[in-house]
């Protein structure tokens, strides 16, 4: 059983997303350690990219800031290596395929294994476009985590279930991340439909920004993914590290509503 699968064995999961290098890599280290200490179950570490198609304005801004700081995939691996012994929860790398191609697929997999990465999410790489890549990371003990949306067909769900492991990333709306105005009424039906074809845990993301929303949603899913709301806190408090870490603690603790 993978480290990610272990998380879901006895409990629901709180999954958070941070952009590596926002506001800088030193602070990213401290944010990850704080999230780990505060009981976050899985941490997604975003690889900044110049044209992040699935990301809303908040995460786009964080990406731009990180790129301006000279953040590269190599530096991200170096940073995560420095804290890998202290982080007890699974780390998942999330990024666009171009970043990985530029780094070199074999190099990426080697570094991911050495850094103790548990899973990989690539929003712009459908499972049927690069089957070899997903097979390779799986062979190396890394979970390929795929995305589905409310309009994903039954046929596609069946195929995705053969490739995906760890958890399935269920996008709650059609659009970009951070849309907290998305209607939530369809989520029960959505989770029931996906569960007919997929037998791994379902985590829901896009638009979760409050304990109330988390409570309403977690009933139907195995985990919640919080990204833009956390990135906003980082952006608003990046000048005061002490306050930033306190705010992260307050916010993440408030989201564990189960």
UniProtKB/Swiss-Prot annotation:
InterPro entries to which the protein is assigned, alphabetical: Aldolase_TIM, RibuloseP-bd_barrel, Trp_synthase_alpha_AS, Trp_synthase_suA
CDD domains reported for this sequence: Tryptophan_synthase_alpha
Active site per database record: 44, 55
Known function: The alpha subunit is responsible for the aldol cleavage of indoleglycerol phosphate to indole and glyceraldehyde 3-phosphate.
Protein name as it appears in the record: Tryptophan synthase alpha chain
Membrane-crossing residue ranges in chain numbering: none
Assembly, per entry: Tetramer of two alpha and two beta chains.
The protein's annotated pathway: Amino-acid biosynthesis; L-tryptophan biosynthesis; L-tryptophan from chorismate: step 5/5
Catalytic activity from the UniProt record: (1S,2R)-1-C-(indol-3-yl)glycerol 3-phosphate + L-serine = D-glyceraldehyde 3-phosphate + L-tryptophan + H2O
UniProt-listed NCBIfam families: trpA
Pfam families named in the record: Trp_syntA
Cited PROSITE patterns: TRP_SYNTHASE_ALPHA
């Amino acid at each position: 059983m993978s480290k990610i699968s272990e998380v879901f064995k006895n409990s629901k999961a709180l999954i958070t997303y941070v952009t590596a290098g926002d506001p800088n890599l030193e602070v990213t280290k401290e944010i990850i350690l704080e999230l780990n200490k505060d009981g976050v179950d899985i941490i997604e570490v975003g690889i900044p990219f110049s044209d992040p198609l699935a990301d809303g304005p908040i995460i786009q801004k964080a990406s731009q800031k990180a790129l301006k700081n000279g953040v590269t995939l190599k530096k991200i691996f170096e940073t995560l290596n420095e804290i890998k012994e202290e982080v007890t929860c699974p780390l998942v790398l999330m990024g666009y395929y171009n970043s990985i191609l530029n780094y070199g697929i074999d190099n990426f997999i080697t570094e991911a294994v050495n850094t103790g990465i548990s899973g990989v999410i690539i929003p712009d790489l459908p499972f049927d476009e690069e089957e070899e890549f997903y097979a390779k990371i799986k062979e190396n003990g890394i979970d390929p985590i795929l995305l589905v949306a409310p309009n994903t067909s039954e046929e596609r769900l069946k195929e995705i279930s053969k490739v995906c492991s760890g958890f399935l990333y269920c996008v709650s709306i059609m659009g970009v991340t951070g849309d907290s105005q998305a209607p939530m009424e369809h989520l029960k039906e959505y989770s029931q439909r996906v569960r007919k074809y997929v037998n791994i845990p379902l985590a829901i993301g896009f638009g979760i920004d409050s304990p109330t929303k988390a409570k309403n949603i977690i009933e139907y899913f195995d985990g919640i993914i919080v990204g833009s709301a956390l990135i906003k806190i980082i952006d608003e408090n990046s000048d005061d590290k002490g306050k930033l870490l306190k705010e992260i603690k307050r916010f993440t603790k408030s989201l564990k509503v189960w």
